[in-house]
């Protein structure tokens, strides 16, 4: 399947599932776990079917010999898991709606029994609530919905569908959804900057495991396979989501159910090649005594309250943001790298946090900060900040400097309240880091890829236009032979409209791609890093305009600067613009007077109605309802554009 085909399938599956949810009167929070469980069962059945002939052949070959092994053992070694007959998707689908919840429960229990790695992972106890919804056939319809995933689809498509549903449920759940899901395009940009090549990856607040999945996909695309992941997540239900996510995406690793502030099952200190995370922001109430002697938290200092604690109460850390920052820095091996999401404000926090930040900067391990556009996250409207650490940096000439990137103006609007990075935008932003590192190969590669994509889009447009013109000629010949001028005119109009739509869509795509190409050439014309006002700047720690002089603030806005907009409007253009605005104002004023007149007439009717008889009052009330309604509608329709 092409990426476009996958997107169509994802949207179709989601729309059907969400329509069923709404029809049954269920909340998204009641619906998510059952959905993810069904996606997993469909994936397991699809993957097992591909290995089944090989599994059965080996079982029969060994049967009755000294090397005989249970079918389950052969399946786990060959396919990665064993799938009992009662968990086959077609069997589940064949069962009556009245018993389907129990059938799914038993299927998942059997899968967990056969596969130690999946024990306690599958949401087997949540299907009874679906069975009790307004629509008694809802569960049956859901099982059928995921049967629509083609049997011959590539295995990795299931991981993409799972990820798509995670994102959609995150949107539905609002604030709660942000606790388990980081928008994919943000994670992909983080991975592109981090550029993992193998080793151990830690996420101490892993949510549903999205960081691991994107890192694994990146490494797979680059030919890397040596990847081991370790995640820590305090919410037990989210741990299940993460473990299923890893299974669906063929990622090896361990997810611990623990609170990172008080437990360290990952044995994090100095043990990881990469750390990636989007931890909870601005957590308060962490017990100070529990973290004060932990090297993973205290190596650069622990935030303290300025005021003394009340007697009889335990001291708490005022804000845990810098506990997380400490943890990311101390979890890295000597050449390890980290990428983390922090709220805007953490980079300039004062008091004890400023002192911690100074130590981190002077240690030379902070490599880059990128401020993101607003509305990139489902739960955070304001821009967030990405911090990048590099433990190898202190041994390089770049030790005493930090790269700042302002990405607030680079985004694609998804809807009125959400934004994302396209693949091209991610690569353009990551190119800044590559050029800063002295890697010119990505510059040439990205330019070539954009030029090729633009040429391909143009060729595809020309091919579609040729097909449409051929269809138009065939239709014209048929209708001309029948001497049907009216139908011929309509057919011609329809084809002209289709051709215009094809051109518009293709030209927009070509313009988008060529716009990225122009951006690269304009900002980095020689294929080398340079400071660009409003976009990026390398700031020294010491010296004029340096980080120390700026109070150890790491806010990119202090260093990158702002592009000064030059008004190139001519006097003639200004006069024409003012005349147009005056004409619009005059029109709106006339309409406002008309509305005032109608309001006065309505008030007059009310007054005359009130002085009449009760029966005539009722009559005028009926008339008033119509008139005042019209007046309100008219007034409302005029207010919108005026604002």
Features from the language model and the residues they span:
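Non-catalytic, mostly N-terminal accessory regions of nucleic-acid modification and defense proteins
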Residues: 1-194, 254-263, 268, 371-374, ...
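Conserved Class I SAM-dependent methyltransferase catalytic core
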Residues: 31, 35-37, 190, 309-389
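Active-site lining segments that contact anionic ligands and/or coordinate catalytic metals
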Residues: 31, 272, 319-320, 335-341, ...
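Conserved nucleotide-binding/hydrolysis micro-motifs of P-loop NTPases
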Residues: 41, 236-237, 262, 280-283, ...
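Conserved S-adenosyl-L-methionine
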Residues: 176-277, 281-294, 322, 342-345, ...
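Feature representing long, continuous alpha-helical segments
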Residues: 213, 240, 277-279, 322-326, ...
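Conserved catalytic motifs of ABC-family nucleotide-binding domains
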Residues: 284, 288, 292-318
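C-terminal, active-site-flanking charged/polar segments
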Residues: 365-366, 376-438
């Amino acid at each position: 399947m092409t990426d476009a085909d996958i997107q169509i399938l994802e949207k179709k599956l989601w729309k059907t599932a969400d329509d069923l949810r709404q029809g049954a009167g269920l909340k998204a929070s009641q619906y998510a776990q059952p959905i993810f469980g069904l996606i997993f069962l469909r994936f397991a059945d699809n993957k097992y079917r591909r290995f089944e002939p090989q599994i059965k052949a080996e079982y029969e070959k060994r049967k009755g010999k000294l090397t005989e092994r249970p079918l389950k053992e052969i399946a786990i070694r060959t396919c990665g898991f064993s799938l009992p007959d009662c968990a086959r998707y077609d069997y589940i689908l064949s069962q009556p709606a009245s018993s389907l919840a129990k059938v799914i429960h038993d299927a998942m229990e059997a899968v967990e029994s056969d596969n130690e790695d999946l024990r306690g992972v599958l949401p087997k106890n949540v299907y009874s609530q679906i069975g009790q919804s307004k629509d008694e056939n809802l569960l049956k319809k859901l099982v059928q919905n995921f049967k629509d995933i083609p049997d011959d689809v590539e295995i990795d498509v299931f991981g993409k569908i799972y990820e798509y549903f995670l994102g959609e449920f995150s949107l539905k759940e609002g604030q709660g959804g942000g606790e388990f899901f980081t928008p994919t395009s943000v994670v992909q940009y983080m991975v592109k900057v981090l550029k993992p090549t193998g080793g151990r990856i830690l996420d101490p607040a892993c949510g549903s495991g999205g960081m691991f999945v994107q890192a694994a996909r990146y490494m797979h695309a680059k030919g890397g396979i040596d990847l081991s992941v370790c995640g820590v997540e305090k919410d037990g239900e989210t741990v299940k989501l993460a473990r299923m996510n890893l299974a669906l995406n063929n990622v090896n690793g361990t997810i611990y159910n623990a609170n990172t502030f008080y437990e360290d099952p990952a044995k994090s200190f100095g043990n990881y090649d990469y750390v990636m995370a989007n931890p909870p922001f601005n957590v308060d109430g962490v017990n100070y005594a529990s973290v004060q002697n932990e090297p993973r938290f205290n190596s650069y200092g622990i935030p303290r309250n300025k005021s003394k604690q009340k007697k009889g109460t335990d001291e708490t850390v005022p804000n845990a943001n810098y506990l997380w920052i400490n943890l990311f820095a101390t979890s890295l091996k000597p050449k390890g790298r980290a990428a983390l999401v922090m709220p805007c404000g953490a980079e300039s926090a004062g008091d004890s946090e400023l002192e911690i930040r100074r130590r981190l900067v002077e240690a030379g391990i902070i490599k880059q900060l990128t401020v993101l556009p607003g509305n990139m996250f489902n739960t955070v409207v304001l821009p967030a900040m990405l911090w990048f650490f590099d433990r190898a940096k202190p041994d390089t000439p770049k030790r005493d400097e930090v790269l700042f990137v302002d990405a607030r103006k680079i985004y694609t609007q998804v809807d009125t309240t959400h934004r994302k990075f396209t693949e091209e935008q991610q690569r353009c932003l990551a190119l800044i880091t590559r050029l800063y590192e002295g890697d010119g190969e990505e510059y040439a590669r990205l330019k070539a890829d954009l030029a090729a994509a633009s040429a391909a889009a143009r060729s595809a447009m020309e091919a579609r236009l040729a097909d449409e013109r051929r269809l138009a000629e065939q239709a014209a010949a048929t209708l001309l032979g029948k001497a049907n001028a009216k139908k011929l005119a309509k057919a011609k109009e329809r084809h002209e409209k289709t051709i215009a739509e094809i051109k518009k869509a293709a030209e927009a795509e070509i313009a988008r791609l060529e716009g990225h190409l122009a951006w690269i050439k304009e900002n980095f014309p020689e294929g080398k890093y340079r400071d660009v006002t409003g976009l990026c700047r390398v700031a020294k720690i010491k010296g004029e305009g340096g980080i120390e002089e700026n109070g150890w603030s790491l806010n990119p806005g202090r260093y990158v600067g702002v592009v000064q907009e030059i008004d190139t409007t001519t006097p003639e253009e200004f006069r024409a613009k003012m005349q147009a605005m005056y004409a619009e104002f005059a029109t709106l004023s006339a309409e406002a007077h008309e509305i005032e007149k109608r309001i006065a007439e309505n008030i007059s009717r009310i007054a005359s109605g009130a002085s009449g008889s009760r029966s005539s009052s009722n009559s005028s009330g009926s008339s008033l309802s119509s008139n005042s309604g019209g007046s309100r509608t008219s007034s409302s329709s005029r207010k919108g554009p005026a604002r």
